[in-house]
Amino acid sequence: MAQKGNIGVTTENIFPVIKKFLYSDHEIFLREMVSNAVDATQKMKTLAERGDFKGELGDLTVRVSLDTDKGTLTISDRGIGMTEEEIKKFINQIAFSGVIDFLDKYKDIANAMIGHFGLGFYSSFMVSKKVEIVTRSYKEGSKAIKWSCDGSPEFEITDAEREDRGSDIILYIDDDCKEFLDKLKIQELLNKYCKFMAVPVAFGKKTEWKDGKQVDTDEDNIINSVEPLWTKTPSTLKDEDYKNFYRTLYPMQDEPLFWIHLNVDYPFNLTGILYFPRIKSNIELQRNKIQLYCNQVFVTDQVEGIVPEFLTLLHGVIDSPDIPLNVSRSYLQSDANVKKISNYIMKKEAARLASIFKENRKEYEEKWDDLKIFINYGMLSQEDFYDRAKDFALLKDVDGKYFTFEEYQTLIKDNQTDKDGNLIYLYANDKEAEYSYIEAAKSKGYSVLLLDGQLDTPMVSMLEQKLEKTRFSRVDADIVDRLIVKEDKKESELAKADQDNLSQAFRSQLPKVEKTEFYVDVQALGVQALPVLITQSEYMRRMKEASKFQAGMSFYAQMPDAYNLVLNSDHPLIKNVLENENKECADQLKPVVSELKGLEARLAALHQTQNGKKPEEITQEEKDEVKTTEQSIEEQRTKKNDIIASYAKGNNVIHQLIDLALLQNGMLKGAALDSFLKRSVDMIK
């Protein structure tokens, strides 16, 4: 006899709430339905193991089937089933009180708690216009019953036909959710959410190619592995087992560097396998490759807040019943168990890395270029990881040798300490582009690190703070004798006027490059040093690089690149340029320089007469005279610079020296490079 009634909820709008609010991601209904079927089946197995069920277990496969003609999706199991009383208790009385209070509390959360409130079954109404349950309990004397509901608070219970224990959940798919009647869509969702569930899940039959088409076989299409690798004891597994499982998770990926098998049952439950992927370039860095499971049921691959941020770059699986199935990210981040899990994972990763470093340093060094991004990111983002990693983090020099922080400090402290007691770490970002600077540093007996990684700029800044009296400087930041200052700077013997004229000759012929500024400096570098070289300010270059990583530093990103063209006044070529300049320009410069000196003396006298006067005491005539004199000085300086520029324009040595410096820095390209090559040939002739 049929029974009708109302589902026990505190408000009649519970189903619209479920449909529109609680489940923002509609596709998870299938996960909930299959997960419930698996739970019922596992309970059946447990009853049999305990002796509470004496009958035959038989086939325990959970089956998912489509009937496109009827518009139904059915999830069937041979689990414990339900009696009529259990239907009324577990289905009709939703464990959900204070719906309005709940909405007020969680209205800003994208994915509210589902399983926590016992609402998993009701996710079926997100995609269904009607749901039927045909069930029969394993208990002796139980009869089959059918429960049906069309999404309103009303339900109906009737007698049904079912020979065996278990349940069929029949979903009559809504007209606006027809994609869930598509075989490929259901296969995709089962592969996503159910591929490691603990009971076999079948969806249709396996197919084979026969008579020119794909046909069904008699073999079930089992979509899951009931004993995934992370559930097994690590001591029973071989390296090849871990590699094969990685290939299952990530087809077409290179073999991982190594892996960590997680297994803890106190103070929380956690199992899993995390892999360090092999990364060939920074472009391949991808987050969210870790899959989170709850009792072998897929939850999410958005694991920020569950694992330390830097470990989101890893691949693999984490499974924990202590992480709720359906929660918001903000809930996860504040959950005490999640925080413990995150800290545990960080400690395990650090311990594994330390173990490999200690037991097989050669292998560790071979893998360092791939590991570096993970370890550096960890040290930058998590203080307690830095404290653990500083003993196994490595520095690599330009010759390919590896050192721990402590080893490298010991190596360079005698030769690379400046006059103020600072330890100077020299480095290059590109061995080829900075080759001559590297060689100049090595000729002084200095060691040069190779810092060519994506995170090396922020790492340098962090290490300068962590390591006492330490400074990093790129090899092209200054001339080699000024990179590590061991005595006061040697001044050029050239008179200031000669330095100014020499600087102007080179300045006038420097290329005009967009967003680039050149400055010219004259220094006494010694006869053996290069005649000309280009350096770049360590501070400004680092600020521009840091602007790529840090918000609020766009000011530096917009600034032009600044370079110093350093002229070695001790070099014969530079001396020759100056000597020729003075000879060629002397007659033209003499009257201009004389006039300029007179004007500068006059301006100094005018300023002298105004010293001590208040602004209102200075007459307009005096102000005009100062302004006129300043304009005249500027005109004479322009004349002087034009004379020098005219000389420099026709001087091939100046052009050649500038181009050589640009070429050394990879800054000579296109037409300028072509002109340099032609000029070089002409000069050789």
Predicted segments — roles?
Residues 1-175, 179-180, 188, 195, ...:
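GHKL (Bergerat-fold) ATPase N-terminal catalytic module, capturing the glycine-rich phosphate-binding loop
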Residues 113, 131-154, 174-178, 184-685:
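GHKL/Bergerat-fold ATPase module in large chromosome/replication-associated machines
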